[in-house]
């Protein structure tokens, strides 16, 4: 009964967005209200609330869960979304987006390669460095600028922002996953490397299938060519990511793998792509290129310098100007680093880049204000969704859903293990949050199934428990595609507010294929 009640918010959200075609902000807000009511009147009687909160007031527990959710939504998710779109709007205001568009089309006039370069290569690079929606918002906005339709731009950006998310924000999701199941609370480098490699193996077929889907959505008439490009780019991506994961850990697969994909796509375009029908191809001076790309170059520099790849700077930023808000009843403290978050890095990068592009500080602030006003519905959507996830977590709903799946599937559990991770990401919008919620559950089930020794998985030897734990992030990356939070980011970036349901409906078939293939890889690898 607890599992059935717990799944009501997820089902309701789908029904409102797909069945009633209700706008995303209205669907999310109404679902939050229903979730709060379930937490208040059903969670305790059904015994869903965790033992550590069993003696707490349900009203206080639920209220503070909503507060925590809103804090998490604003700091840093909404700030990052705002700054990502602000960075694009600066390019529009300075008209440098026209230079970038001409540069992309000077590489090749093959639309499929352009789209793949943006959403798979550039998008993966953004995910690896920053995460938190930048890899959906920025490529989608650039595609719109290149003349692609909003719905198409949103869909391919969501499909592209999947396999890289497990290693997004310099590997935070997989590192968190391993720390959650480590006995000491801090995973060894060997465990992180093994789990990273396992996740990439489980995702291997999707490194080829997803580029093929993206290419085919762009051009349905050249399937053989699409397959060849997908094999070329996909194999290079997965091999480079596997080597990085196996030898270096979780920090570099998305970054280096995406750079390899970018090089592979450009190489193919230069060698094999059809020649442009235009006799004269525009060339650009170094100064012109640096000016046009200054916003994104500064984003790359700021995020790399402030991130985990530069430990001294990262440690300094994380230890200074950190606000802490104690959350009674939840026994937790919400912390936000004012100078260490990706949102500030995006703001500084975009503003400095805008100045380089000739905009005054006053004009930049006008662009920022206009961007903020245009995102008002997105604010409601994101706050409602993250608060909803927090309420479901503290009321025990998410654990009840997972436990129900374990009870039903038994020995076939590895087949649905990625679905657990996908549910976590669908609800929370975050691969990292999904791993926090379900890492211990996956490890516990592995022990129940006797998966405690060593084995060989598609040619790689390692721990059976790590294989099943890795399945959580494998599924979580697929759930990212249809997470209402990701959908909200796509609608904002493509100026499609109110059409969340249409985007969700178009993405669901690809997400289901993703999760099913992930489940088959996990199951047959056992």
Predicted segment positions?
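Hydrophobic mid-bilayer segments of alpha-helices in multi-pass membrane transport proteins
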Residues: 5-15, 24-47, 78-84, 208, ...
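Transmembrane helical segments that form the transport core of multi-pass membrane transport proteins
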Residues: 257, 276-424
